[in-house]
Amino acid sequence: MELLLLSNSTLPGKAWLEHALPLIANQLNGRRSAVFIPFAGVTQTWDEYTDKTAEVLAPLGINVTGIHRVADPLAAIEKAEIIIVGGGNTFQLLKESRERELLAPVADRVKRGALYIGWSAGANLACPTIRTTNDMPIVDPNGFDALDLFPLQINPHFTNALPEGHKGETREQRIRELLVVAPELTVIGLPEGNWIQVSNGQAVLGGPNTTWVFKAGEEAVALEAGHRF
């Protein structure tokens, strides 16, 4: 399988998806036809989100079609060489994808050679479940099981920083709480600016920041760019 799972879409001082464009270009391998799944968009319309994505990817020669615009979404997925899932609200993304019965066809198409690109919520959707999302508002997606293309749970936008005087939990504390009730999970705290690239059966960590791996009953493990999962 070919996956590009990004923690986020924007870095300080850079345009939207700018940091991701070289990564995407490097993994295209001649692919040009893409479907975009915009359902995580809540404060922007799906048309706006699709047009924005198409515009930024056009210089790479990628032709983007919004999945919500086609008469036969399953046929569009089958024909697609690239499946792109945008960030936003993970619950809304999973709900809409499940209601349209897109999860199994997307997973099957990626397993048969389509490149999967997802940032933030799109990276969450590639995991076994969406139980490590950060998102609100919460809508009922009728179950948390997701695409299960990547075997570990990703927590995107990972940071352990708290504003001065803030008394809420750190991100690590919240992940630790999850591991109490679901000790079978392994969670990757993926900071902004980092990504996981899967190609030829190898998953490789990229990005400038330390990534953390959390398991029940164990100390967190720090990983740097180049680590192979």
From Swiss-Prot:
Protein localization: Cytoplasm
Gene3D superfamilies linked to this entry: 3.40.50.880
GO terms of biological process kind: proteolysis
Keyword Protease applies: yes
Keywords: Cytoplasm, Dipeptidase, Hydrolase, Protease, Serine protease
Primary location class: cytoplasm
Enzyme nomenclature, EC number: 3.4.13.21
Reactions catalysed: Dipeptidase E catalyzes the hydrolysis of dipeptides Asp-|-Xaa. It does not act on peptides with N-terminal Glu, Asn or Gln, nor does it cleave isoaspartyl peptides
GO cellular component: cytoplasm
Keyword check for Transmembrane: no
Pfam families in UniProt: Peptidase_S51
Top-level taxon of origin: Bacteria
HAMAP family linked: Peptidase_E
Name of the protein in its database record: Peptidase E
